[in-house]
Amino acid sequence: MATFHFDLVSPEKLTFSGDVDQVDVPGVEGDFGVLAGHAPVVAAIRPGILTITTGGTPQKIIVLGGLAEVSEKGLTVLADVATSIQELDRAQFADTIASMEAKLAEKEGSELDKAIERLDHFKSIQSQLNTTALH
């Protein structure tokens, strides 16, 4: 399988840089996979699980929004937050969801809609974390 260069950057660090077979990205308009030779595109990403496949081995990383750019040079993801599943404190993640739920009562209108959407994304990540495929 042909490979391409992939960089995953967050404000804290360069999380990943190297040649990969495939990257599956949680896009705002829907999830999408990137392979070598993918057409150029810029897309917003939503909170979700990004999967990097190298040599047939998947590596899963939680991203909490950002931007993905596919160019002739490869794929670059600028993530608001990027944490490998192994590094995630699941109890803290559950506490974050509980806190988000508690704060919903303080929101109104479009602010409430955005908060509900973000909460739904976090709950989706939590659900995926609880599946055996990620362990």
Curated annotation (Swiss-Prot):
SUPFAM superfamilies membership: Epsilon subunit of F1F0-ATP synthase N-terminal domain
Membrane topology: Peripheral membrane protein
GO cellular component terms, semicolon-separated: plasma membrane; proton-transporting ATP synthase complex
Main localization, broad class: membrane
Compartments reported by the entry: Cell inner membrane
Cross-referenced InterPro entries: ATP_synth_F1_dsu/esu (IPR001469), ATP_synth_F1_dsu/esu_N (IPR020546), ATPsynth_dsu/esu_N (IPR036771)
Keywords carried by this UniProt record: ATP synthesis, Cell inner membrane, Cell membrane, CF(1), Hydrogen ion transport, Ion transport, Membrane, Transport
Keyword Cell inner membrane listed: yes
GO terms of molecular function: ATP binding; proton-transporting ATP synthase activity, rotational mechanism
Ranges annotated as spanning the membrane: none
One Pfam family from the record: ATP-synt_DE_N
Record-stated family: Belongs to the ATPase epsilon chain family.
Subunit structure: F-type ATPases have 2 components, CF(1) - the catalytic core - and CF(0) - the membrane proton channel. CF(1) has five subunits: alpha(3), beta(3), gamma(1), delta(1), epsilon(1). CF(0) has three main subunits: a, b and c.
HAMAP family with a match to the protein in the record: ATP_synth_epsil_bac (MF_00530)
Job of this protein: Produces ATP from ADP in the presence of a proton gradient across the membrane.
Protein name, per record: ATP synthase epsilon chain 1
Source lineage: Bacteria, Pseudomonadati, Pseudomonadota, Alphaproteobacteria, Hyphomicrobiales
Gene: atpC1
